[in-house]
Amino acid sequence: MLFRSEVDPDTFEVRPLKLTAVQEFGRPIHPALAQGQIEGGTAQGLGYALLERVVMRNGAMANSQLTNYTIPTTLDMPELDVVMLENPYPGGPFGAKGLGELPMDGPAPAVVNALRSLGLDVREIPATPELIASCTAAA
């Protein structure tokens, strides 16, 4: 996963510019569906990295509605390049391996590494403007 972004120095908001998702999962049986799975999982992973925070109060989720639990929309998504590396797996049907939710795994580490390249000691997600501001103050 390659992630390119900008961080607003005044608001500490991360603006994703481009994501490149590289996935190896054997031979894709249905390439268009595999592409969609990668795009959707990458969007979920980006939301997990930048937006989605679970708030618990008295053992219950306090932000369980779409009005107060922020998830990414198409307007939040950067340019996305998907690269599928075909490497047929002899133990799978028609050379396939599982794809599943694998695309969700890359965005959070990519976002944190991008922020660390700016000298920010980010140790948790989501990397909200408030968190980035606190990392800036601690630096």
Regions from the language model: what does each represent?
Residues M1-A139:
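Cofactor-binding beta-sheet edge motifs in enzyme active sites
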